[in-house]
UniProtKB/Swiss-Prot annotation:
Reactions it catalyzes: uridine(55) in tRNA = pseudouridine(55) in tRNA
HAMAP family in the cross-refs: TruB_bact
Family listed: Belongs to the pseudouridine synthase TruB family. Type 1 subfamily.
Stored InterPro entries: PsdUridine_synth_cat_dom_sf, PsdUridine_synth_N, tRNA_psdUridine_synth_TruB, TruB_C
Enzyme Commission number(s) from the entry: 5.4.99.25
Gene Ontology annotations of biological process type: mRNA pseudouridine synthesis; tRNA pseudouridine synthesis
Active site: D38 (nucleophile)
Keyword tRNA processing: yes
Functional description taken from the UniProt entry: Responsible for synthesis of pseudouridine from uracil-55 in the psi GC loop of transfer RNAs.
Name recorded for this polypeptide: tRNA pseudouridine synthase B
Amino acid sequence: MDGVLLLNKPKGMTSHDCVAKVRRLLGVKKAGHTGTLDPNVSGVLPICLGKATRIAEFLTGTTKTYEGKVTLGAATTTEDADGDIIAARPVDRPIARAEIEAVFDSLTGEIEQTPPMYSAVKVGGKKLYEYARAGIEVERPTRRVTIYELELLDEREQFFGETVSFRFRVTCSKGTYVRTLAVMIGERLGYPAHMSDLIRTASGPFRLEDCVTFEDVERRAADGTADALLIPIERALFHLPKYEINDKVAEKVKNGALLRLPAFLEKLTGRSCLFRPSGKRWPCT
């Protein structure tokens, strides 16, 4: 069984647990996801099965789109709704739509983030959440990420209340912490904040409406039609530029030979996919 399963990950499960369950339901040995979702986040989780695990790295670096909710008035240990409140301040004035949109504009483009303590980023050989669980806060290296689009989804012109929540949509680069983005939004509006809800609606070319649930997988596995749920490897790579090579060159590529770049590929940037007339493809950088 080779291909990519687009799973609509439910809340309450780790991405690792989702892969393990798919492996068990479909009876496959090789499986891996293409980008971790936190347990309290649902949505698009592509899982590569069989030979498709070889292309996982070509799917992990794609842009991601999320829809979520920011809540102003309280900050938490985890930067989301699962953490303990560490700072609180009632929202003591109306928040105007134009003010939120101005903050969104200021956070669009390349920005610098500090990973949250409750994350899997490694510092000194240990994951940050291991320090956090031991009550230790360590200095974290910042990272540069790109926010391609940041849109306010609520239609209200004014937001009132001791706590204020509003929904947003963001398209961002790999490695972006959306919970940290929620905290940054709060800081620029002058209040402690956290991310109170999040769903991934797209991962690269894959959309939420194309995903299946565990119930779908179980039903198809039971009647022996689970293959129909998989996206073939060739289709999973359709977002990459395609270049045809002849069988002689293809064999050299297959064997890892170092080749002179053909003239028509000299201006190639980023990743691409080479294929031979028989249809076999090799993703490459």
